[in-house]
């Protein structure tokens, strides 16, 4: 069992006084696999003050100094990918061979490599006539991250913050805290200066809220639910600090009538079920021509039944458990709601898959004949539940897609790239994937509407951690 009860504050591993202990549960076995400490406002204050003391020195380091440290982090990270992947599998259930090793752990490394690449070529100053425009580190940052892609979400914040010259306090999810602890070890090993990076475990009320509210925190970057994001914004408001939010989604996957139907449905089902549906940008609404609904249902059922649910340590497992008992119950409630509202259940349903007597395993579930008024069409379920929604024409498909309080991602499949591009222009989302295109580490990630504000990834995420200063008369008259 992992004993991760220490915090990392001011370059030291410290056992926090007065902190409660919390058990970390392996969602595949429902057994205790670790212990952490739940911090308090006092621990947050210690970490923030350490970050504040470190800021003046770290913010004045040269680009080359920060780049050298980032490159050391990348080398150390790469050497520990297997260890990190196993920790992710243990803490939140991602299948080791098919997800944690090829995607979850390398995604974290990818953000550090991208941050180093951006920093290498980034110009922090530019001239506008006699005025000099300077980009400077934003300050002390409070970083609050979720459990679904634990290290990916951490690295998407920590890497650009380090590159920009900020100092920080990280609060990872108490449900999946192992990979954050391993990253702190890497920082300690490579010699990140004391106070530049601090780790305080805890829950939202005990650590997240005081971190967002702390007067010495200049910027808060939060990824999680829209409900929690509003609480973070409220806590941060009295100090008028910058707040960047990456929140929920209910992404539409528009399959146009000229698309390769089998390819589009297969990709849509598999992408939806990836990570057991626990991705904010999951294509959870599949919009299909009414004339092809029967064929889509047949294909979707076929591809759904191919998915292997089981022990995340087995190499043939496609999807593992949901990350917690609470999430399992939420998904079950949503499936019940779909049945009660009269949606057509074509695959899956309530309870665990056959042969799995324990663990937070849910059946990959597909509903069809879903309309936009139904709860399952509007709620972010965050589990392996796909809604198939028929439309009459392209304009109606776009209207259905945009009829959501969320606006994180969209997906379009078409035999005509030009047609797909035209639909993409009309979607009110922060990203659109055309014909199965993958995510891009250099592209911005973030949403419209209640999916949040600000952007992560690439230079766009890097610039979130910079302030802009205008120095007039810099060149003289």
UniProtKB/Swiss-Prot annotation:
Domain of life, source organism: Bacteria
Keyword Oxidoreductase: yes
Swiss-Prot/TrEMBL keywords: NADP, Oxidoreductase
Pathway named in the protein's UniProt entry: Alkaloid degradation; nicotine degradation
Any one GO BP annotation for this protein: nicotine catabolic process
EC numbers: 1.2.1.83
Entry's Gene Ontology molecular function annotations: oxidoreductase activity, acting on the aldehyde or oxo group of donors, NAD or NADP as acceptor
Catalytic activity reported: 4-oxo-4-(pyridin-3-yl)butanal + NADP(+) + H2O = 4-oxo-4-(pyridin-3-yl)butanoate + NADPH + 2 H(+)
Presence of keyword Oxidoreductase: yes
Active site feature: 246, 280
InterPro entries from the UniProt entry: Ald_DH/histidinol_DH, Ald_DH_C, Ald_DH_CS_GLU, Ald_DH_N, Aldehyde_DH_dom
CDD domains: ALDH_CddD_SSP0762 (cd07138)
Enzyme class: oxidoreductase
Residues reported in the UniProt entry to bind NAD(+): 202-208
PANTHER family: ALDEHYDE DEHYDROGENASE (PTHR42804), ALDEHYDE DEHYDROGENASE-RELATED (PTHR42804:SF1)
Protein family according to the UniProt entry: Belongs to the aldehyde dehydrogenase family.
Functional summary from the UniProt entry: Catalyzes the dehydrogenation of 3-succinoylsemialdehyde-pyridine to 3-succinoyl-pyridine in the nicotine degradation pathway.
Protein name: 3-succinoylsemialdehyde-pyridine dehydrogenase
Origin species: Pseudomonas sp
